[in-house]
Amino acid sequence: MTIQYENLTIRQAEAADAKQLAAWWNDGAVMAHAGFPNGLGITEEEVKKGLGGGCMVIEEEGRLIGECSYRSVGDGVAEIGIKICETDCQNRGVGRKILSMLIGWLFQNGCSKIILDTNLRNKRAQHVYESLGFRKLRINVDAWNDQLGQPQSSVDYELLPTDFNSFAM
């Protein structure tokens, strides 16, 4: 699967991407929002073994800048995730476009609902999700502990095709 819009590409992650994915996933600054302020401690070989399915990379003008994923959770529902890992690509609307590309593709390919969750502290992500039409379902207060044992809260969202505001048209 490859999705393109303007200078952005979403494509299936390949073995050649494993080195960069491992670097991002081992970077606490990149992974803190997901509960791993010390990174995952994963090897390139472990990343290679886990590739496939809905693990994708994001390119801007051919440069790897992040990753996203989706998985079917049944009944036409897909759960998605995204990380714009390169800081010089953040706060420029890239994430909103990438999400629009991925969500549009999922809706065109039979999904009837998209779900996701994000850390309650990640206000930037919440703003992006809500601008795309996601509806906040619930806040899960102190629902889990990060790798340092600190309680974390999350926000659950859902998006229906009729509510979707695409930024990749």
Model feature map: region roles:
Residues 12, 23-38:
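Helix-loop element at the rim of GNAT/NAT acetyltransferase active sites that forms part
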Residues 91-108, 127-131:
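Conserved acetyl-CoA-binding loop-helix of GNAT-fold acetyltransferases
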